[in-house]
Amino acid sequence: MEYRIEHDSMGEMRVPADRLWAAQTQRSHENFRIGVDIETMPREITHAFGILKKAAALANAALKPEKMTQEKLKAICSACDEVISGELNSHFPLVVWQTGSGTQSNMNANEVIANRANQLAGARLCHPNDDINMSQSSNDTFPTAMHISAVLAIEDKLLPAVELLIGTFKRLEAENDDIVKSGRTHLQDATPIKFSQEISGWRASLERDAELLRMAVKPLHELALGGTAVGTGLNAPKGFSELVAAKVAELTGKPFVTAENKFHALTSKDELVFAHGAIKATACDMMKIANDVRWLASGPRDGLGEIHIPENEPGSSIMPGKVNPTQCEAVTMVAVQVMGNDVAVGMAASQGNFELNVFMPVAAYNFLQSARLLAEAIVSFNNNCAVGITANREKMHHNLYNSLMLVTALNPYIGYENAAKTAKKAFKDNISLKEACVSLGFLTAERFDEVFHPENMI
């Protein structure tokens, strides 16, 4: 491998000749061999850095035109566009497990953008610190990258996934509105319910989750950029905070604004905790929905067997013909991961000391993993399972009329205690509720038929 020599304030470093990063990135790459090539800084953060560095260059060009010349601006914006598009992903090698402020990742962005801008300009125009990092600090850029990436993850990935599954459940509701089945509480038989009503519970849960996500994402539109090192805005020109936030809003199409209090924006991660709570709530509902689906599909002969789900792949290496509810299992595992990530995000957010939180990379890593995994899991569950759910009408009818909890319909006619005696006798003697009720002398066969209509119990 060929190398070139780069330098920073600590001296010279050998850097691979074909890489755009420079000395500070190389130092971090060598000093933090933790999760290398596996737990790298999320690409969402890298792309967010491209957005905020472009926004900063545009703001600086307006406020400091003597320093951010049009020639520099053009080259920097072009380089940033390549970062945003992912073309330069291979030039961002750093791991999550680095400095807690994300300083090295900020410098990784500064170095790559500067070197790429210089390549595009055909001249050594741009300096990583003096130009790309102008009016900024790692302490306000990393929190800004966190918020940009979090907003994009929720609004552009997770919410569309949730809405997709909501649409599928709406269709299933309409298709199954004529089916009455046995309800269940405590994993025990309960009074009847329409299958469409059961599905409506799934759908309404996700609609509420979407509402919570939209509410929780709003505070993340506030950006720390302009607070610089400790929130005072040192070395940032007047008006920079407002202008750079407006530029980020233009570039993303999202209503980003400058944070009202930069001291809070640098040291507190409460908005991230709040938003991840909404992600966790969605994961909790997906856990419930997926579990319901696999319970209802259990069998095919010895389980509930009330619905059919798509058979996507063989389920066992030893039991021929076995097919498992794999999509349900995948989404429930993702839900568990999200719940674990919520603990990590909360713990990281609690570590803001004085003017800065220095657990930001781990908070961002877990937050973005949660949003990404859950969005992809929901889409997979929808496309490979939910869209193919069909009712086993015969089994639902059999289970409904075999349920002892239908005896609840007799309460108004024979009373609670006599209804309980009827259910117990039917179970003990393995006879129908009608046979038990008549043999106990509570109702005649004719009267039983008059008052006993499970379809009217919903």
Where are the predicted features?
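Conserved, well-structured ligand/cofactor-binding cores
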Residues: 1-458
